[in-house]
């Protein structure tokens, strides 16, 4: 069962917004588990769940890795036959660097790399923003307060987001892992979120 945007855009938009609210509720549960379990709680099952809830009733292929090509502007993500391997590497890199990288580094890497792989048919950006916040909170040891949390701030500040993605992509194309622009971007948005609470 799913709704097509072209059939009823208002209804589609309402379902999409409800899905986003449900994703944030699930994300909060995931963060609470991550605060107790640490790096072992970050796995593909959590990623599948976050993606599935984001596209429930608007896409038939939510919550599983894509099995077809996908194109994102000028970026060509890995071939679908390579997605599972790239995701294993991604998850392993997060887990192995959990206590090495700063929380903003871990979150920035997650935000960039998941977008670079683009493992899902739909809602890669929504899933990556949720993962970013999960990593930031779970690695920091706190569920940060906010009336407007980081994923919403990223969604509203697309220029900085897209610029940081492109910078990390260029570095990777040149043979370097450098997501420092993304880290600065994430840190700035977190500061703005915490400033609302005088933190």
Task: Name each region found by the language model.
Residues 1-199:
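FIC/Doc superfamily catalytic core
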């Amino acid at each position: 069962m799913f709704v097509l945007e072209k059939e009823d855009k208002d209804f589609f938009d309402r379902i999409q917004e409800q899905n986003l609210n449900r994703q944030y509720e699930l994300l909060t549960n995931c963060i609470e588990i991550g605060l107790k379990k640490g790096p072992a709680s970050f796995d593909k099952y959590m990623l599948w769940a976050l993606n599935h809830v984001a596209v429930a009733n608007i896409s038939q292929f939510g919550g599983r890795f894509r099995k077809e090509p996908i194109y994102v502007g000028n970026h060509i993500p890995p071939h679908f036959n390579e997605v599972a391997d790239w995701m294993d590497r991604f998850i392993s890199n997060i887990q192995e660097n959990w206590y090495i990288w700063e929380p903003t580094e871990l979150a920035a890497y997650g935000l960039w790399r998941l977008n670079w792989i683009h493992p899902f048919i739909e809602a890669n950006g929504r899933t990556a923003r949720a993962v970013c916040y999960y990593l930031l909170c779970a690695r920091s040891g706190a569920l940060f307060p906010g009336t407007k949390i980081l994923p919403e701030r990223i969604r509203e500040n697309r220029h900085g987001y897209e610029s940081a993605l492109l910078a990390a992509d260029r570095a990777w194309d040149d043979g370097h892992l450098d997501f420092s622009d993304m880290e600065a971007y994430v840190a700035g948005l977190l500061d703005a979120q915490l400033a609302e609470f005088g933190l």
